[in-house]
UniProtKB/Swiss-Prot annotation:
Its EC number is 6.3.4.16, 6.3.5.5. This is Carbamoyl phosphate synthase large chain. Residues 404-553 are annotated as: Oligomerization domain. InterPro entries: ATP-grasp (IPR011761), CarbamoylP_synth_lsu (IPR006275), CarbamoylP_synth_lsu_oligo (IPR005480), CarbamoylP_synth_lsu_oligo_sf (IPR036897), CbamoylP_synth_lsu-like_ATP-bd (IPR005479), CbamoylP_synth_lsu_CPSase_dom (IPR005483), MGS-like_dom (IPR011607), MGS-like_dom_sf (IPR036914). The gene is carB. It catalyses: hydrogencarbonate + L-glutamine + 2 ATP + H2O = carbamoyl phosphate + L-glutamate + 2 ADP + phosphate + 2 H(+). Composed of two chains; the small (or glutamine) chain promotes the hydrolysis of glutamine to ammonia, which is used by the large (or ammonia) chain to synthesize carbamoyl phosphate. Tetramer of heterodimers (alpha,beta)4. PANTHER family: CARBAMOYL-PHOSPHATE SYNTHASE [AMMONIA], MITOCHONDRIAL, CARBAMOYLTRANSFERASE FAMILY MEMBER. PROSITE patterns: ATP_GRASP, CPSASE_1, CPSASE_2, MGS. Mn(2+) 2 binds at residues 300, 302.
Length: 1081
């Protein structure tokens, strides 16, 4: 069937901010969909609240709305734009839930808008647990014994019918298992049921008999309007049932299915997608197989593009989201051409002659109090993927891609082996470190059978891992020169890195590299081509392997530039850096360079086969990057866009490129590694600041507790302490006493023994300011934007809301900031981007830090000002001047854009929600409007904060902030809110003339206390600033209850003032919507 000509304008719903369970994969799918529909001549309207996404670039869609993804706002956009259809399958769970809401409320019918990609009955049947179960019964596909409950009483009845624990709780219409879990007894069960009902938007849960120990598989399936169905990829979970698939190591294609079992899953998948009624596009279907007898049960399906779709796309080269968008407008699979081969249609199922492994990355260290245990609720914050000719090769490459300080399956550090009893408990309970517990187990002599008994991991995988430990022992018994060429090739084919070989043979990585090359053992690069080399591939998408085959890298005469990506997402380094890498690839391709992207993250736009001219899906380690440099011989390498990942490689790369035996003429483009090191090295940086007469907070350096105590007492408490060389404020804290400092030093020095601890005076009640600037090789400096933070200095900049333009900075302060930025950019010889953070106390400005690289604010600044900083910076690095590019002065927009952080506390039930100097947000949203109040209100709504415009506010302030809270409380009363407070706060308010404030009891003062008020729905939002030790427990419990009951909680005075401005705006007039293209002219 040809494309539908009855549609002209199509709205795509995005996924919003990056959260656990919904990350960059939806930027990837949304970007592909925008391109595919525009290619077909449709007018595209995009709605998404995430400024860090490529899809919200103004040139990607015809009309781009960076607005909150809530039904009331999307209705206004529909009313304004009058699209013919809405495509909801590209924006994850957020977009599906929005589509259901707009459909059921009658909005789509009112404006004559059609749902394409998935109709309402298909979405509901795929997402509603009861309807899905009924559908499976109709087609004879077995499901797990289960029952649906909408109350505790119903849940008790379901548990009685199933008959035995453990039971699995799965809330309906939630993302990444939010609110779910495994209950081993009745008490746990009832707690989890209540939590699950609260988390489900429709207060419905599915209770299932536990299939712990069964194997888990996924199939990626596509269907068109002519009822053609293709299976794109099978994926096997290394971890058995009981661990969320997003937290499990996964392998494609499935390794341990018999042909008969695979055919059965395939037949079931085709029957399921037809019965559910997904007419056009992709679905992900999850199965469980009993290893004892081969019984199959279907677990669930996602009637949309998913995290697994992104993985399947990158694993096979088959662009699922692009094809799904084309199917949604009427094409059939056989009418769509495969871009990679240019010969085969999309109905030609991909075949792959390699193995792909994905390993998740966790951030439990960011959430003290949260147990590092994996279950059915997803907790990982990112993932790395690797490709190899064997499972062993791809598995070890994926482990070293994670960037967690490990270089493969062990064999990379001296370790004390645990006791057998401790090890058994580590193996029995799924946790992020379990993969290395397997390594310990083989070293302690445990058998495959014993380990399988404890973990239920398939013996096939365990055999392969045991084989790696045998190779490790073989290497440790020999010197490097004892290893023959055949030995070394076999070792490299198993995925061992040079670093691991060096550890085993007691040599250095450089010695291993030199010896390996002297024996002629170098990697070859193979193409990901969707067809196992049956047809020629036209898109250079490569992976390395050590099989003795020919290298498939295509020669080229164009000058090449290599861009090093950011690796797996983590807190502190996410989509913002991928955005910068993509922009570099786009602008340098347009300038005539051949761009080479190196990255290991399957979720991102940068690892899409058509973002750069060449893509290497490889780990970002010294060994892997040097191998690619030698294969490609680029003229330049860009390291300043991928966050800390490529920066860590700067010095070793420079050392290699300067060495006499380097066979290539490659240069690192932009700011030199030496200048980057100067900014990172406290002593070198201070010397420059001293020469330039730039102030910084009083500070010092310490290597142990005694030194740190002397420094802290010299500069006076409170102080900020942190290790040198960090991103995302890792292990950074504000301490108020010698006792707190001693606890910190004991904990933090273990983290970075090689680097000293930095101690700075903490500037209380200071305003923090971020500046992004551009500098060219002539020393011309142009400020991209000056951003004013809403939370005061001391809250990590990545967790703080901020505003463009600034709202309260004086002319004197602005002059100082601009002068210091220019002086520092020149002193550091910056070429490209630099980010500087300042703190302002009154009219006194202090510099906090300077980073001569792309920062996480670059996409936000680019969207707010319309000036693509990363594109400009990459052209500057290629030798262009800012004058030539027409960028000569700072641009201050007439509108206001507010960026707000999105935090993942709901996934970590034990963690405190209080913000501090260590970054914990996973993503961000932007609100844009004509004034600050409206823009901040939109940012809060986009971040999921429900701002009530009437009702009761509970106020509990620390002694330090009680005075400052008075004006905020006065304004809330002016706005018509009822204010209630703790006795101490009420006393201060009364002293300042605020009468009639009711006292609410603290937890230890009797009942009904504040938590009772929260649970009874008597409070609409909370202002609670953290107090001293004795009331910390109260504050923590209140903050946690606010999160569980979805109440807005403000923990700073500055946040209170901004919220008052937003509430005033919302009361004055309803929010309006406007396309980004109209703001930017």
């Amino acid at each position: 069937m040809p494309r539908r000509n009855d549609l002209n304008k199509i709205m795509i719903l995005g996924a919003g901010p990056i959260v656990i369970g919904q990350a960059c994969e939806f930027d990837y799918s949304g970007t592909q969909a925008c391109k595919a529909l525009k290619e077909e001549g449709y007018e595209v309207v995009l709605v998404n609240s995430n400024p860090a996404s490529i899809m919200t670039d103004p040139e990607l869609a015809d009309r781009t709305y960076i607005e909150p993804l809530i039904p009331e706002i999307v209705e206004k956009i529909i009313e304004k734009e009058r699209p013919d259809a809405v495509l909801p399958t590209m924006g994850g769970q957020t977009a599906l839930n929005l589509a259901v809401s707009l459909s059921k409320s009658g909005v789509l019918e009112k404006y004559g808008v059609e749902l394409i990609g998935a109709k309402l009955p298909a979405i509901e049947m795929g997402e509603d647990r009861e309807l899905f179960k009924e559908a499976m019964a109709r087609i004879g596909v077995p499901v797990c014994p289960s029952g649906i409950a909408s109350s505790i009483e119903e849940a008790r009845q379901v548990a009685h019918e199933i008959g035995s624990y453990p039971l699995i709780i799965r809330p309906a219409f939630t993302l990444a298992g939010t609110g779910g879990g495994i209950a081993y007894n009745q008490e746990e069960y009832e707690e989890m049921v209540q939590y699950g009902l609260d988390q489900s938007p429709m207060s419905q849960i599915l209770v299932e008999k536990s299939l712990l120990g069964w194997k888990e598989y996924e199939l990626e399936v596509m269907r068109d309007l002519a009822d053609n169905v293709v299976i794109i990829c099978s994926i096997e979970n290394f971890d058995p049932m009981g661990v969320h698939t997003g937290d499990s190591i996964t392998v494609a294609p499935a390794q341990t299915l018999t042909d008969k079992e695979y055919q059965r899953l395939r037949d079931y998948s085709i029957a399921i997608i037809r019965e559910i009624g997904v007419e056009t596009g992709g679905s992900n279907i999850q199965f469980s197989v009993n290893p004892a007898n081969g019984d199959v049960i279907v677990i669930e399906m996602n009637p949309r593009v998913s995290r697994s779709s992104a993985l399947a796309s990158k694993a096979t080269g088959f662009p699922i989201a692009k094809f799904a968008a084309k199917l949604a407008v009427g094409y059939t699979l056989n009418e769509i051409s495969n871009d990679i081969t240019k010969k085969t249609p999309a109905s030609f199922e991909p075949t792959i002659d390699y193995v792909v492994t994905k390993i998740p990355r966790f951030a439990f260290e960011k959430f003290p109090g949260a147990e590092p245990i994996l279950n059915t609720q997803m907790k990982s914050v990112g993932e790395a993927m690797a490709i190899g000719r064997t499972f062993q090769e791809s598995f070890q490459k994926a482990l070293r891609s994670l960037e967690t300080g490990r270089f493969g399956f062990g064999c990379d550090r001296h370790e004390t082996l645990p006791t057998l009893s401790h090890l058994r408990s580590q193996l029995r309970t799924p946790n992020p470190e379990r993969v290395f517990s397997l390594h310990h187990a083989f070293n302690l002599g445990m058998t495959v059978e014993e380990i399988h008994e404890l973990t239920a991991i398939d013996p096939w995988f365990l055999d392969k891992l045991e084989d790696l430990v045998k190779t490790e022992k073989y290497m440790k018994q020999r010197s490097l020169k004892d290893l023959t060429a055949a030995d070394l090739r076999y070792i490299k084919q198993q995925g061992f890195g040079d670093r691991q070989i060096a550890f085993a043979t007691k040599t250095t990585e450089d010695e291993v590299r030199a010896y390996r090359k002297s024996l002629g053992i170098t990697p070859v690069y193979k193409v990901v081509d969707t067809c196992a080399a049956e047809f020629e591939a036209f898109t250079p998408y490569y992976y390395s392997t050590y099989e003795p085959e020919e290298c498939e890298v295509l020669p080229s005469d164009k000058p090449k530039v290599m861009i090093l990506g950011g690796g797996p997402n983590r807190i502190g380094q996410g989509i913002e850096f991928d955005y910068c890498c993509c922009h570099a690839a786009f602008s340098l391709s347009d300038a005539g360079y051949e761009t080479i992207m190196v990255n290991s993250n399957p979720e991102t736009v940068s690892t899409d086969y058509d973002t750069s001219d060449r893509l290497y899906f490889e780990p970002l380690t010294k060994e892997d990057v040097l191998n690619i440099i030698e294969a490609e011989n680029p003229v330049g390498i860009i390291i300043q866009f991928g966050g800390q990942t490529p920066l860590k490689l700067a010095v070793p790369l420079q050392k290699y490129l300067n060495s006499p035996d380097c066979p290539v003429q490659t240069k690192i483009w932009g700011t030199s590694p030496d200048s980057i090191d100067t900014a990172e090295d406290r002593e070198r940086f201070e010397k420059i600041l001293h020469e330039l007469e730039i102030s910084q907070p009083p500070n010092g350096i310490a290597r142990d507790y005694e030194e740190s105590r002397v420094v802290a007492n010299r500069i006076s408490y409170p102080v900020v302490v942190r290790p040198s060389y960090v991103l995302g404020g890792r292990a950074m804290e504000i301490v108020y006493s010698d006792e707190e400092l001693e606890r910190y030093m004991t904990y933090a020095v273990q983290i970075e023994p090689d680097h000293p601890i930095l101690i700075d005076k903490f500037l209380e009640n200071a305003i923090e300011v971020d500046v992004d600037s551009l500098t060219d090789s002539t020393g011309k400096v142009v400020i991209g934007s000056i951003m004013e933070h809403i939370e005061e200095a001391g809250i990590h900049s990545g967790d703080s809301a901020c505003s463009i333009p600034y709202t309260s900075l004086s002319d004197n302060v602005l002059t100082t900031i601009r002068q210091w930025t220019e002086q520092l950019a020149r002193a550091l010889n910056v070429v490209g981007l630099m980010n500087i953070q300042y703190a302002v106390q009154g009219d006194q400005v202090y510099i906090l830090e300077a980073n001569p690289r792309a920062s996480r604010t670059v996409p936000y600044v680019s969207k707010a000002t319309g000036r693509p900083l990363a594109k400009i910076a990459s052209l500057v690095m290629s030798g262009k001047t800012l004058e030539e590019l027409g960028v000569t002065e700072e641009f201050i927009p007439q509108h206001v854009a507010v960026k707000e952080a999105v935090l993942p506390f709901s996934k970590f039930p034990g963690a405190d929600t209080l913000l501090g100097p260590e970054m914990r947000s996973t993503g961000e949203v932007m609100g844009i409007d004509s004034d600050f109040g409206k823009a901040f209100a939109k940012a809060e709504l986009g971040a999921g904060v429900i701002l009530a415009t009437t009702g009761t506010v509970f106020v509990s302030m620390s002694d330090r902030t009680k005075e400052a809270a008075v004006p905020v409380v006065r304004e809330l009363i002016d706005l018509g809110f009822k204010v209630v407070a703790t006795s101490g706060t009420q006393k201060v308010l009364r002293e300042h003339g605020i009468e009639g404030v009711e006292v609410v009891l603290k937890l230890h003062e009797g009942r009904p206390h504040v938590i009772d008020w929260i649970k009874n729905g008597q409070i609409q939002f909370i202002i609670n600033t953290p107090s001293g030790e004795e009331s910390q427990l109260d504050g923590r419990t209140i903050r946690r209850a606010a999160l569980d009951y979805k109440l807005p909680i403000i923990t700073t005075i500055a946040g209170g003032k901004a919220t008052v401005a937003a509430l005033r705006s919302l009361q004055d007039h309803p929010l309006d919507v406007k396309a980004l293209q109209d703001y930017l002219g």
